[in-house]
A protein has these predicted regions:
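Membrane-interfacial helix-loop-helix
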Residues: 1-25, 50-132, 136-143, 168-183, ...
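Transmembrane alpha-helix interface/packing and boundary motifs in multi-pass membrane proteins
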Residues: 24-45, 120
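Re-entrant/interfacial helical elements at transmembrane boundaries that shape
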Residues: 36-50, 129-137, 163
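Central hydrophobic cores of alpha-helical transmembrane segments
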Residues: 41-42, 148-150
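Transmembrane alpha-helical segments of integral membrane proteins
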Residues: 154-167
Length: 190
């Protein structure tokens, strides 16, 4: 019996580490590369906040720091890929539907500039496409950097904290995993 107690205590910290790894990876890749278009970033953030509020071994400060870093560096990678490869990076995907979305994102960027980088964080697909568009359009690096910091904080930290504080609403805490699953499944289906 002591053997099972020992194994259980040795693996008790894997849950939070796995959560950090999954959330950080999804946030980074959704922000960094075109195949990230299909990842459910916002629902993952909200769900991670819900889980952090209900699990004592998940450190909300560590989670928020990881999310900010993953979102920030993900967008930086997207920007650099756009800067290096230009429009050809965006043309790799020949899907007519995706090309239509890319054109809309380019118009959004041309119209809104700095704010498009911040606002894009809150719009699925657009958050993946605007950084390489900004890079390909030769947006000044420090301008992008500032918008990226604001966007990563507002989106990554903001949505995660919304999930975290939602768990304090009576009745929500008992259904945290069902709610988290609903948000993740809903974003995958849509």
């Amino acid at each position: 019996m002591e053997l099972f107690t020992s194994i259980d205590s040795q693996f008790a910290d894997i849950g939070p580490l796995l959560l950090y790894l999954i959330v950080g990876t999804i946030v980074f890749f959704e922000s960094a590369v075109l195949f990230g278009l299909f990842l459910p970033g916002s629902s993952i953030l909200f769900s991670a906040g819900l889980v952090a509020a209900t699990e004592d071994n998940v450190d909300i400060s560590a989670l928020l720091t990881l999310i900010f870093i993953a979102a920030f560096f993900g967008n930086q990678v997207g920007f650099v890929l756009g800067r290096i490869f230009g429009r050809s990076y965006l043309n790799k995907r020949k899907s007519p539907g995706l090309q239509k979305v890319i054109l809309k994102c380019e118009r959004f960027y041309e119209k809104s500039g700095w704010w498009s980088v911040v606002a894009a964080r809150f719009i699925p697909w657009v958050r993946t496409l605007v950084p390489p568009i900004a890079g390909a359009s030769k947006m000044p690096y420090y301008e992008f950097l500032a918008a990226n910091v604001v966007g990563a904080l507002a989106w990554g930290v903001g949505i995660t904290l919304a999930g975290y504080y939602t768990a304090s609403i009576p009745g929500v805490k008992t259904f945290t995993y069902a709610i988290a699953g609903f948000f993740i499944l809903g974003s995958i289906v849509s």
